[in-house]
Swiss-Prot record:
The keyword Transmembrane applies. This is Oleosin L. The proline-knot motif may be involved in targeting to lipid bodies. It is a multi-pass membrane protein. It comes from Pinus massoniana.
Length: 141
């Protein structure tokens, strides 16, 4: 008797409890519902393709040019909006830079301006030196 009771207890240790059974039930039911919905979507797609394919073939000489015009108009509109946004961002950057507010890249602009000014000063000095030397040679000749 004790061996049967011990065997029964060991089987009960591996038996699923109520929460595991309920989770399994809801997972199977949810999977079934989702599989049914996907089957309905597939059936609807097939039916619509069967109905609309002849209509599309009959109207394609009209639909394709209209679609191309709409696509080009949408692309042009998106390009115009993008260019407008870029222009507005550039104007905001210039406004902030002119007012002395911190802007992205202003350090590079300032360094380039200083380097350009230094190069201009150096070129000015070189030209003055050359002109002075040419004038002094002309005076001695």
């Amino acid at each position: 008797m004790e061996a049967a009771q011990q065997k029964n207890e060991s089987v009960m240790d591996y038996a699923p409890d109520w929460t595991q059974i309920s989770v399994l039930f809801f997972v199977v039911m949810g999977g079934g519902v989702l599989a049914s919905l996907s089957a309905l979507a597939l059936a609807g797609t097939v039916v619509l393709m069967l109905i609309l394919t002849p209509v599309f073939l009959l109207l394609s000489p009209v639909i394709l040019p209209v679609g191309a015009v709409i696509a080009l108009a949408a692309a042009a509109f998106m390009a115009a909006v993008t260019i407008g946004i870029a222009g507005a961002a550039a104007l905001i950057w210039v406004y902030r830079y002119a007012r002395g507010q911190p802007t992205v890249g202003s350090e590079k602009i300032d360094r380039a301006r200083v380097r350009l000014f230094e190069a201009a000063e150096k070129l000015k000095a070189q030209l003055q030196y050359k002109l002075f030397n040419e004038n002094s040679k002309a005076n001695f000749d």
